[in-house]
Regions:
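Flavin (FAD/FMN)-binding glycine-rich loop and adjacent Rossmann-like elements that form
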Residues: 1-344
């Protein structure tokens, strides 16, 4: 859980990382108390490891079509002061737009996602740190808090006079997609848990595996999403402003702006043989925070999930531990299922 330090595995992106610029607006209120949405007052040393994880958010399915749009409403327990930091940010940057990403998706809809480059967005920075170790009750509280924040933010952006007019007008024309998540009030029922626990197996994927030693003897698929971590904390700076810490902006190829392809090794989804022999882990894989920031996306999980299913079937057929299946036959079976295993 959390982030390895920079020296621990020789990863240049590890630990606390400050790729975003500090914001020179007051982040404190009465008696210099941090405003809501500030997670701390101590600036972590660059490269220091800790328990923190990247922010969670909801992926919103939105629409601008009046015939398929449900307007944002004032949520229960709404307090506009929770978004005072947004007010001050917009006052300092009145030409700023909507603070989250909108991606066109089929059906004339929009996918609303936390903006990795935004200073403030739909991600509730710093309020998910205890999720990995939490029980069901605490996880539900975290889920509820994220929903409350998100619904409140959408309403705030649409109605608060401190929000620039161009943003309020755009928000008035946006709404939840009427034909999505109807049983849940058109709000997505699943929280986007970008990162939680990670396994430590016999092979531990690191930054070097993503960017340098990209070929492996036991590939189960190809990953290519850039190393991409969202904010882990938002801190008051010594001058009273704030800085977001933890974002790793995507490292892309210079040629086509895409991620760098690398082989995903089978060993990264198998536990240590001394600990467990009948488990495959294609999501919370054996990887550092930095490496996981690349492999943590659905295309990679689908590839690893299918390969894990085939491996599980072979372990049963061969009556052996998952670590000991016949790798030659495994590779051939993956190819019959059209898994891409080579970089060329």
């Amino acid at each position: 859980m959390g982030r390895e330090g920079r020296e621990e595995l020789g990863e240049s992106f590890a630990g606390a990382v400050y790729q975003k610029k500090a914001v020179g607006i007051s982040a404190t209120g009465n008696h210099k108390k941090p405003l809501p949405l500030i997670s701390g007052t101590t600036v972590s040393p660059e490269g220091q490891g800790d328990h923190r994880i990247m922010t969670y958010s909801f992926r919103l399915c939105l629409s601008e079509d009046p015939a398929n749009r449900v307007a944002f409403k004032k949520p229960k327990g709404y307090h506009a002061d929770r978004y005072e930091l947004f007010r001050r940010f917009y006052k300092s940057s009145p030409k700023s737009g909507i603070p989250f990403d909108l991606y066109p998706i089929p059906g004339n809809k929009l996918d609303g996602n936390n903006g990795i480059g935004a200073q403030l967005s739909t991600g509730l920075v710093g309020e998910n740190w205890d999720y990995p170790n939490a029980g069901i009750k605490r996880r539900q509280e975290i889920w509820d808090n994220h929903r409350s924040y998100t619904e409140g933010l959408l309403y705030f952006l649409m109605t608060d006079p401190a929000v620039p007019e161009q943003v309020r007008k755009r928000m008035e024309n946006l709404g939840y997609a009427k034909d999505e998540f109807a049983r849940h009030g058109h709000f997505p029922p699943v929280l986007y848990v970008r990162e939680a626990r990670r396994m430590v197996g016999d092979y531990f994927l690191t930054q070097k595996d993503i960017l340098e030693t990209k070929e492996k003897p036991d590939p189960i698929g190809i990953g290519s999403f850039p190393i991409d971590s969202h904010d882990c904390q938002r801190i008051v700076t010594p001058d009273g402003g704030f800085i977001n810490e933890g974002t790793i902006f995507p490292a892309k190829t210079r040629i086509n702006g895409r991620g760098i392809a690398y082989q995903i090794p089978y060993r990264a989804i198998t536990p240590k043989v001394t600990e467990c022999t009948n488990l495959l882990v294609p999501v919370c894989i054996s990887a550092s925070h930095v490496a996981f920031s690349s492999i943590r996306v659905e295309p990679a999980w689908m590839v690893m999930g299918e390969s894990a299913g085939i491996a599980a079937a072979m372990a049963i057929e061969e009556n052996t531990a998952v670590q000991n299946i016949n790798q030659v036959k495994f590779s051939e079976r993956l190819k019959t299922k059209h898994q891409v295993l080579t970089l060329r």
